[in-house]
Amino acid sequence: MIVKFSWFAVTGLSNLLELLQFPFMQRAIAGAILMGILGGFLGSFVTLRQLSFFSHAVGHAALVGVALGVLLQLNPTWMLLPFTLVFGLVVLYLIDQTNLSSDSVLSVVLSGALAIGVILSSLIQGYRGNLMGVLFGDILAIDTSDLILTGLVLIGSIIFLLPTLRQQILLTLNPTMAQVQGIPVRLYRYAFVVLLSLAVAVAIKAVGVL
């Protein structure tokens, strides 16, 4: 029994090492590591600032960007970035400028974006491989440009959050006190939403919109 187990262990290890020699597997592992670090770095602030539904809404609304990319015969990833960025900023602006709660604004905008995304998806003729791949995700389909984008977003997050960590923590726990102390609350909020939107966009190809 021990001999059989050892043989299976050696065989499994050799197969794993053989898999790691393929470039697509190396990119998948590198992408998973980068996204894990990025998610952990931003996730604490997302949870404490109650932005979980916001990031969820950005991911689902990205269906519009994906459908537009397929219709225009462009790389869906490059359409995702500007769309999720604009969507996040517009939602935050509406939350600041209206008396509605953030959940109400997110629900309305998300429903509208999903409706537009479904309409655009129905206009796509023929093969929908790009659309399906982004909807459900495929970490093995990550290419070098995706790794570069994820790395850039991670570097940008580190550059923004680490030097201002004390201010970010105070802003997270007590926004009023942060504003009294002269911290640019509005600027920091919008900058964080930009990073969060970009993080969602670069992760969609691996984990999917749905």
Q: Where do the language-model regions lie?
A:
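Short amphipathic alpha-helical coupling elements at transmembrane boundaries
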Residues: 92, 96, 133-141, 176-180
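Transmembrane helix-bundle core of multi-pass membrane transporters
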Residues: 12-27, 106-167, 194
